[in-house]
Amino acid sequence: MIFMFGRTVSGFGSRAKRGAAPLSLSLNVTSGDLEVVGPAGGTVTAGIVDFGINITATASGGAGGYSYAWTNTEMADDDGVFSVYATGTTNASSYSGLVIAMDTSGDFGGEEHTGSYRIRCTVTDSASATATADFTLNVTGIVE
């Protein structure tokens, strides 16, 4: 309490409570393109690890106690030749093990195909807040 000129003032002013910063997520990606190369007449695979593509998520803010969930979605495949062969690790801060397959059974050699996949990480903190971040993986398929 403050006494001023015979008056009593209580509850003078207030201070906002400061909590944790909002949950946020960023991705660190080394390299970015995947190339699938192989002969006509079968299925050829290539993984992101084979090309030195490392994708790491960094969460900050929120309530802590982070859990990670990774997904991949085909965004483009003009010739319909690509598919996910293996999803890889989907519940850690780093995403690895994604393998893309290319069907070359209808090719005769010399063809080039392009596609892309959205790699998405969703982080959830211990208070169930979520944040997401995306990366586009470009895929080129070359049939020898």
Please give the residue ranges for each predicted region.
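A short beta-strand segment in extracellular, disulfide-stabilized domains
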Residues: 46, 50-59
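Short glycine/proline-centered coil/turn motifs in the loop regions
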Residues: 60-64
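C-terminal edge beta-strand
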Residues: 131-141
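Short, solvent-exposed loop/edge segments of extracellular or virion-exposed proteins
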Residues: 26-46
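Exposed beta-strand face motif in extracellular beta-rich ectodomains
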Residues: 113-119
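Enriched but not universal
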Residues: 1-28, 142-143
